[in-house]
Amino acid sequence: MYQGQTSSFLRKADQKQGDFVDSAQPDPNAELYAWHYEDSSLPDEDSLLRIKVVGFEAELRTIGFEYHEPSSTLFVTNHGRQGSRIEQFNLDLERLTATHVRSIIHPLVSIPNSIAAVSDSEFYVTNQHHFTAREHPLLWAVETYAALPIATVAHVRVLENGTIDAAVVARQAYPNGIVLLNKTTLAVAATSKRTVNLYTVSPAADAAQHPGLELSSSFWLPFLPDNLSVSKGDGALLVAGHPHLPSLSKFSRSRRICHRPEVLASQGQEVQDMCGGLGTASWASEWTPGGGVRHIYAGWDYPTSASVVRDRERRVGIVAGLYAKGLLVWRD
């Protein structure tokens, strides 16, 4: 989910795009929508509009994307069966089309999760693990629960000739959400450590080099941080995440049945009651250099909070759940 800097549109991935369940039949491809949230009186059919994807026929299994508004560039992570990569699109919000430009494939973009765009040809990306759960399940579990600082943050450039140039600029435990707070500060969630790391960005020495990152500080959260964003209008760092891992795990495993009506209909009453009664908590907070951490929402009414954005000018905030149907919206 992403909020533009000047537009009153919210861009989001369809929250029902897939549950990433091994050996299960894949869901239909992810979809992209634009939501005009400025006028709360508009019905959904007038405010929530599907973006047509043009020139892309492959699988699209996304868990994160980034919109670079000055260049109308949309970067989308893709974990299809063809291998992990990042898809680049040109997004036309007037025509509601996303035209595919290229697939960005590189060995250092191995498990792309979240993206922080610098331009239409440059970005930072988190690879949430060093080991993949599919190829190395035991090592993946050890890396996750021991919070080993071996996963990477990569800096990626698309050169003028189309070559992909990438370098590892930081290593940490479970790098998840990432966002540029300003030109010299990059924030990265460390999910398994319940912290957000703040890195100082040093410019590259020359055109052939990559920028440098130096860890300057961190702050702790009472939940597992997922995605990050910058609040429009006041510049606060927004963080959404998961406060109760056992219920999140149970909820996520159940979605391959509970989110598929055709499967749920064939189950007994006990399973249907289970789907109706399962829940998990959400938490969203903000951080500022002067005020520290302030909590925005914590509760069980809306499940699996993964992203939070806010528009101070229009007095609206939005939380998106990893496995939720719909969005949590508040208005001041």
Per-range role (PLM):
Residues L42-F56, E94-L108, A154-G177, N197-L198, ...:
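Blade-edge beta-strand/turn elements of extracellular beta-propeller
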Residues D27-A30, V54-E69, I105-F123, H130, ...:
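Beta-rich, blade/repeat-based domains predominating
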Residues Y2-P26, T77-H79, T126-A147, G241-L278:
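Short, conserved, GDST-rich strand-edge loop motifs in beta-rich repeat architectures
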Residues T6-S7, E38, S71, G80, ...:
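Residue-level signature of beta-propeller blades and closely related beta-rich strand-turn architectures
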Residues E45-A133, P137-W140:
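Asp-box/WD-like beta-propeller blade repeats and closely related beta-sheet repeat scaffolds
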Residues M1-V53, D92-T97, L327-V329:
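Beta-propeller domains
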Residues M1, T73-F75, E122-Y124, T185-V188, ...:
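Conserved beta-propeller blade signature
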Residues L245-P246, S305-D332:
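Blade-level signature of beta-propeller repeat domains, shared across WD40, Kelch, NHL, RCC1
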